[in-house]
């Protein structure tokens, strides 16, 4: 039998060993761990939709009629009326030609790069999500990676002679940094490039100034029409509270994904009950902005309080906040200090982030109260004071 004991031991001693915790989620802000109720700042269920009774009842109703599995891939018999309607509805919400629903955000990015040949040049941020990096590597497409959020460095890789692909997250999942999509769009036009935006952490929650925005997204937050983006990816497992993802863009793009998107072609389709629950969640979010408004009130409150306490961290208008440590062992130690205070946060370490960029990751949701946020920041303030000594 093959043994990995030495490798596991080495990871543990270096502070990079990953571990799972068995938790029970009460909602997006409260979890039970080791029989203790804790305040959680771990969840990407930003609007608390996974616990919405209307959505849960829709899932139950659909499961009672259609069962809990799709039974086959989308190109066999797994593509139902519900899948078709969801794709049409997303395309209408975002004002694009077509949409393809897939099983996960990772799969969406893998599918997207399947349709390009190895002659293409993909330009990515150095802190891109693993799915963006791996989607190009697997398909043996040339990758150039520019300094984080550095559009001047990005432009050095663009060439008038080639149709390069600029592929970026809108909101970086491990830092909370927000891409200036407007600048990317300008470079796309200047060099006749192709622009892909992965909006996993922006779809449904991005701060959107447009009154006619059906469903909030990062492109609208920069006043960029979705039709100006060659491919846009969003997920259902975050703001929408279900599971799955989608790619949208021109009809030709979606048709080609159906022809060549191998993870889509060869995977069992999402269950119809999940699709029906997702449709219901989207309809609620389009018609009722109360949870969206509560989330942004919580984000503003966090930012104001953190500034007042002089805690050093980037304070964007998104829900992801990070506190830089720079050492894996110290990061794990600080995570334990939060745990002793009854708070769950995530220790992010290499290889998820570059070495020396180890940090504490915090996510704000609409379920958090001011009391929750104050408790978190008071604990963080004490840690920050100790760290600064």
Features from the language model and the residues they span:
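Conserved active-site segment immediately N-terminal to the catalytic lysine
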Residues: 192, 213-236, 255, 259
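Conserved PLP-binding catalytic core of the aspartate aminotransferase-like
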Residues: 293-300, 307-342, 352, 357, ...
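Conserved N-terminal alpha-helix of the aminotransferase class I/II PLP-enzyme fold
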Residues: 57-104, 299
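PLP-dependent enzyme catalytic core of the Aspartate aminotransferase-like
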Residues: 53, 57-61, 65, 88, ...
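Active-site phosphate-binding strand-loop segment of PLP-dependent enzymes
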Residues: 45, 144, 148-197
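Conserved core segment of the aminotransferase class I/II
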Residues: 231-233, 240-289
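N-terminal "arm"/small-domain region of PLP-dependent enzymes with the aminotransferase-like
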Residues: 2-6, 10-66, 162, 193
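PLP-dependent aminotransferase-class I/II
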Residues: 119, 124-168, 290
């Amino acid at each position: 039998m093959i043994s990995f004991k030495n490798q596991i031991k080495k990871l543990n001693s270096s502070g990079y060993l990953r571990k799972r915790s068995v938790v029970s989620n009460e909602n997006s802000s409260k979890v039970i761990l080791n029989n203790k109720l804790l305040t959680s700042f771990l969840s990407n269920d930003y609007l608390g939709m996974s616990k919405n009774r209307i959505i849960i009842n829709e899932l139950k109703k659909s499961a009672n009629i259609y069962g809990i599995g799709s039974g086959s891939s989308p190109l066999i018999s797994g593509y139902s009326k519900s899948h078709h309607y969801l794709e049409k509805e997303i395309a209408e919400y975002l004002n694009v030609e077509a949409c393809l629903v897939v099983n996960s955000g990772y799969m969406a990015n893998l599918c997207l790069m399947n349709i390009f040949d190895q002659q293409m040049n993909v330009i990515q941020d150095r802190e891109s999500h693993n799915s963006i990096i791996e989607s190009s590597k697997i398909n043996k497409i040339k990758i150039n990676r520019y300094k984080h959020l550095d559009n001047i460095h990005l432009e050095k890789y663009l060439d008038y002679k080639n149709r390069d692909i600029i592929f970026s997250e809108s909101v970086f999942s491990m830092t909370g940094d927000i891409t200036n999509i407007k600048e990317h769009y300008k470079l796309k036009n200047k060099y006749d490039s192709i622009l892909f935006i992965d909006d996993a952490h922006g779809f449904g929650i991005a701060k959107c100034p447009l009154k006619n925005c059906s469903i909030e997204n990062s492109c609208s937050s920069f006043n960029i029409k979705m039709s100006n983006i060659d491919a846009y990816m969003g997920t259902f497992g975050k703001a929408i509270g279900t599971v799955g993802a989608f790619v949208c863009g021109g009809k030709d793009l979606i048709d080609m994904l159906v022809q060549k998107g191998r993870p889509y072609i060869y995977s069992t389709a999402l269950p119809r009950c999940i699709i029906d629950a997702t449709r219901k969640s989207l309809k609620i979010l389009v018609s009722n902005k109360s949870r969206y408004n509560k989330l942004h009130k919580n984000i503003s409150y966090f930012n104001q309080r953190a500034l007042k306490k002089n805690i050093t961290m980037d304070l964007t208008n998104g829900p992801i906040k990070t506190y830089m440590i720079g050492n894996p062992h110290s990061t794990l130690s600080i995570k334990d200090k939060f745990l002793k205070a009854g708070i769950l946060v995530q220790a992010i370490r290499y290889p998820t982030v570059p070495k020396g960029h180890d940090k504490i990751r915090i996510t704000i949701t609409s379920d958090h109260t001011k009391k929750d946020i104050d408790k978190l920041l008071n604990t963080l303030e004490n840690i920050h004071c100790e760290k600064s000594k």
